[in-house]
Amino acid sequence: MENQTMSNNIPTELKYVASHEWLRLEEDGTITVGITHHAQELLGDIVFVELPEVGANLAAEEQSGVVESVKAASDVYAPIAGEVVAVNDDLPGAPETANSDPYGAGWFFKIKPANPADYDGLLTAEQYAGEVD
């Protein structure tokens, strides 16, 4: 499937949650998580990122990190239950990457879902667009 983006910077191939995290299902069954373009826009210039620990078992909607900007601090939530299998080690040293490339190099962590079927029930790009309009 070709990657497409809605006019409001919401890639159509990803899944979303109302707390403004995006999810991408990888070929190995893990899920990459980051904050959306909308979230980084609301936050402004991001100056600090705290990520979860590799090996942490997170419940869906459990706080998994923190993002601080010049305007505000915001919690990051696990959009799906599972075990953290990787974190973006480059992000704490270059938190502005979450602003400049939120769907690419600005990813936060990868999680091995406790129940892979949970991914299917998350918001589509169109549904998420309805949440932020």
Swiss-Prot record:
<dbReference type="Pfam" id="PF01597">
    <property type="entry name" value="GCV_H"/>
</dbReference>
<feature type="domain" description="Lipoyl-binding">
    <location>
        <begin position="30"/>
        <end position="112"/>
    </location>
</feature>
<dbReference type="InterPro" id="IPR000089">
    <property type="entry name" value="Biotin_lipoyl"/>
</dbReference>
<dbReference type="GO" id="GO:0005960">
    <property type="term" value="C:glycine cleavage complex"/>
</dbReference>
<protein>
    <recommendedName>
        <fullName>Glycine cleavage system H protein</fullName>
    </recommendedName>
</protein>
<dbReference type="InterPro" id="IPR002930">
    <property type="entry name" value="GCV_H"/>
</dbReference>
<dbReference type="GO" id="GO:0019464">
    <property type="term" value="P:glycine decarboxylation via glycine cleavage system"/>
</dbReference>
<keyword id="KW-0450">Lipoyl</keyword>
<dbReference type="InterPro" id="IPR011053">
    <property type="entry name" value="Single_hybrid_motif"/>
</dbReference>
<dbReference type="InterPro" id="IPR017453">
    <property type="entry name" value="GCV_H_sub"/>
</dbReference>
<comment type="similarity">
    <text>Belongs to the GcvH family.</text>
</comment>
<dbReference type="GO" id="GO:0005829">
    <property type="term" value="C:cytosol"/>
</dbReference>
<comment type="function">
    <text>The glycine cleavage system catalyzes the degradation of glycine. The H protein shuttles the methylamine group of glycine from the P protein to the T protein.</text>
</comment>
<feature type="modified residue" description="N6-lipoyllysine">
    <location>
        <position position="71"/>
    </location>
</feature>
<dbReference type="InterPro" id="IPR033753">
    <property type="entry name" value="GCV_H/Fam206"/>
</dbReference>
<comment type="subunit">
    <text>The glycine cleavage system is composed of four proteins: P, T, L and H.</text>
</comment>
